[in-house]
Amino acid sequence: VKFKSKFVLAVLCAAVSSAAFAGKDEDQQIKFRQSAYSFTAWNCSKIKSQVVDHPETFNKEQVIAAANSIAAVANSGLGALYGPGTDQGTGWKKTRLKPEFFEKQDEVKKVALSFNEEANKLAKVAANGDIGEIKTQFGELGKACKSCHDKFRIKDE
């Protein structure tokens, strides 16, 4: 029931955010998008530190909070922040979104769903507190992120 309530809340947030951001200019969409991914990266670094790099520091509650934060971003309706023209422009910094993102919507859908599924699985696994399972699922989330980056993100210069 708790998961179902969170799912309904996520769907409502996605609907509201889609409507709210539909009229924002491209740079604002890029800024919001970059903020969401920076927040995700910060939470991933907390999990990596406690599960991969320094498992002796594992704190179940902190890892659960980080995993839930990542899942919240994945369920937040980020697609609304990829409006036409957002492959160019500057948010906090110049976007690295490739123009192919808008040309390959079937592939975009696959990577977006993968990110969503793996983030939600990570939150579920984290709640159980098994560090080995968390590490494995964290790796699966990393693969989902890498898949999108490899296809749709301009490499750092």
Which residues fall in each region the model found?
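Cleavable N-terminal signal peptides
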Residues: 9-10, 20
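Short, linear, compositionally biased motifs with a strong N-terminal bias
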Residues: 13-14
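Sequence context surrounding c-type heme c attachment/ligation sites in exported
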Residues: 23, 27-157
